């Protein structure tokens, strides 16, 4: 009989839990929580993601099927749909956002020496957004059009390893240019983006390659100093 650790527990061992605990403390995630801690919440959702669960009911049924083994997987609290739904609704999302950023930074280090087909030593990023449709009756706060709900996912992808280095979720109506105000540019890096991000008021400090069809007016030419 196998007496070793479950594969899930072995995977979770690689997580920087000291950063997670720090985030929980910073945002008081476990304040007045008695049974289902932030750690339980994260482990349940991580398990759901890794095993392709599709609903809260699916998560509940799957985890309850291995109820005697949950302790060895690190899950101490009782798992139910209502508990998961309440945690998803009430818990401070910044706990998991900060932890996700720490995981992303760890993953990027694993691919930092990976060669690009373009033979560039500098970091190359791809910036884009995608609109995710939502059922308006279930998500009334995400109104996009009269009878349609949506949110927009803005992603900055590090092409070494194809790892997202920056992620923002906004209202579906938010213009793509919004993300340029959120980004902290990396010196010497290349950013690949489509024409939706063309805005001279934001990009005048950058060297960029534009489309031949672009229409612009030069209001003033400055002589090079020195």
Q: What feature does the model see in each segment?
A:
Residues 1-226:
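Conserved, well-structured functional cores that handle cations and Mg-NTP chemistry
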């Amino acid at each position: 009989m196998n007496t070793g650790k479950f594969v899930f527990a072995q995977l979770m061992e690689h997580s920087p839990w000291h950063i997670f605990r720090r985030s929980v403390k910073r945002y008081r995630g476990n304040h007045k929580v008695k049974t289902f801690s932030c750690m339980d919440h994260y482990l349940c959702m991580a398990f759901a993601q890794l095993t392709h669960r599709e609903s809260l009911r699916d998560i509940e049924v799957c985890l309850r099927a291995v109820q005697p083994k949950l302790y060895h997987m690190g899950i101490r609290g009782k798992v139910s749909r209502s508990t998961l739904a309440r945690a998803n609704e009430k818990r401070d999302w910044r706990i998991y956002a900060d932890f996700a950023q720490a995981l992303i930074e760890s993953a990027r280090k694993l691919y930092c020496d990976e060669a690009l087909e373009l033979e560039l030593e500098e970091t190359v990023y791809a910036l884009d957004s995608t609109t995710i449709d939502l059922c308006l009756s279930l998500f009334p706060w995400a109104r996009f059009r009269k009878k349609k709900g949506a949110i927009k996912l803005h992603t900055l992808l590090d092409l070494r390893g194809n790892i997202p280095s920056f992620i923002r979720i906004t209202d579906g109506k938010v213009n793509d240019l919004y993300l340029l105000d959120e980004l902290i540019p990396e010196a010497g890096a290349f950013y690949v983006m489509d024409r939706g991000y063309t805005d001279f008021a934001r990009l005048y400090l950058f060297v960029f390659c534009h489309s031949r069809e672009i229409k612009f007016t030069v209001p003033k030419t400055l002589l090079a100093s020195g």
